């Protein structure tokens, strides 16, 4: 089999988004909170031609609708108050600048602002992934697949993004993922998610072998039950073996039981397709699929509806607080 890292990508890193100063969270703790959230086709109000057709055709979509949606996203960010946000389905870097401008006036403490940001997507892609952080970001790399050994042509696949986050004096290696959807059939498209898993595991293995603190986050479009688990572990251990060689922990088993209900609601059924996967030298202090005003009364995600301008996303945000210390002696 052949695997190449190739393709043209846009990668953009912003440092000190707020003009009034650049600080990072300065406590000595190794504790850090992270949210990963698929924000559901988050386009801006400018038409570049790569947008999905329902946004291009819609008479309801424009500056006013975009600004209203942006405000709601920022309200969720303030409410969850995570140190790091990993977003899937962001159109471009300009949205990160708009987020920063929207948030900059709400905190007198610059250490509480998200002064660091990154955006990346393939040149031909409509949407990409973004990171906003209170901690400095560095050394971003984008990794694509070029598979030519399958019977069918490789579809458009989003890249894996690797970057480093300096959490006070401790380095966290963060991998951002948005894997192939099941559109076109779960079984038929599984081969491409397998390839993406192989790519991620090969990248993680290098950091794993040097004892780094590693966290993979994103929308994997694969339920936790569909991953391969450690054969010698208890069923509720939460130890997933990525690519058959990299053992990582899934907090969907936080507390020793499978967390309910899930993060994505489709065809009247909950799924757990959004994930954190962590090296085992990281301790999880909290984990949840966060609920709030971004949910319907029933608790399911309030998906964004372009024809009404209402809603948030068809996914729930996943929240975790982790300690970059496996015995949890360095976290408050």
Question: Each PLM stretch: what is its role?
Answer:
Residues 22-106, 121-122, 324-331:
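N-terminal, active-site-proximal structural segment of metallo-dependent hydrolase catalytic domains
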Residues 58-64, 81-89, 117-119, 149-151, ...:
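Second-shell loop/turn segments in exported
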Residues 40, 90-91, 178-180, 220-223:
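Catalytic metal-binding/acid-base residues of hydrolase active sites
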Residues 28-34, 43, 155-181, 324-327:
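Beta-strand-turn-beta hairpins that frame and shape the catalytic cleft
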Residues 90-171, 179:
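Structured beta-strand-rich core segments of catalytic domains in phosphoester-bond hydrolases
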Residues 167-197, 202, 207:
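Metal-dependent phosphoester/phosphodiester hydrolase catalytic core
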Residues 11-21:
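Bacterial N-terminal signal peptides
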């Amino acid at each position: 089999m052949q695997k190449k890292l190739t393709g043209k990508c846009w990668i953009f890193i912003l440092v000190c988004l707020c003009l009034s100063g650049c600080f990072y969270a300065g406590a000595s703790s190794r504790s850090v909170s992270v949210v990963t959230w698929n924000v559901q086709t988050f386009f801006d109000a400018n038409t570049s031609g790569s947008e999905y057709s329902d946004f291009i055709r819609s008479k309801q979509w424009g500056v006013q609708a975009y600004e209203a949606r942006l405000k709601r996203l920022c309200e969720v960010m303030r409410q969850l108050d995570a140190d790091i946000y990993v977003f899937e389905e962001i159109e471009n870097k300009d949205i990160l600048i708009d987020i920063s401008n929207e948030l900059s006036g709400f905190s007198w403490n610059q250490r509480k602002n998200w002064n660091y940001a990154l955006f990346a997507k393939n040149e031909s892609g409509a949407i990409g992934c973004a990171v906003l952080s209170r901690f400095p970001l560095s050394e971003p790399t984008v990794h694509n697949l070029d598979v030519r050994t399958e019977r069918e042509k490789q579809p458009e696949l989003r890249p894996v993004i690797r970057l480093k986050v300096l959490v006070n004096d401790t380095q966290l290696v963060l991998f951002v993922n948005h894997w192939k959807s099941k559109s076109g059939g779960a079984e038929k498209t599984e081969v491409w998610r397998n390839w993406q898993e192989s790519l991620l595991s090969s990248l993680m293995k290098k950091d794993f072998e040097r004892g780094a603190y590693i966290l993979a986050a994103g929308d994997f479009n694969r339920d936790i039950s569909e991953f391969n688990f450690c054969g010698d572990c208890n069923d509720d251990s939460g130890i997933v073996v990525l690519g058959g060689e990299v053992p990582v922990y899934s907090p969907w088993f936080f507390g020793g039981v499978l967390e309910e209900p899930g993060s994505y609601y489709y065809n009247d059924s909950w799924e757990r397709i959004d994930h954190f996967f962590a090296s085992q030298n990281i301790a999880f202090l909290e984990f949840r699929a966060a609920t709030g005003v971004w949910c319907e009364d029933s608790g399911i995600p309030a998906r964004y509806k372009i024809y009404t301008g209402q809603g948030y996303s068809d996914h729930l945000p996943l929240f975790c607080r982790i300690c970059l210390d496996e015995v949890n002696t360095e976290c408050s």
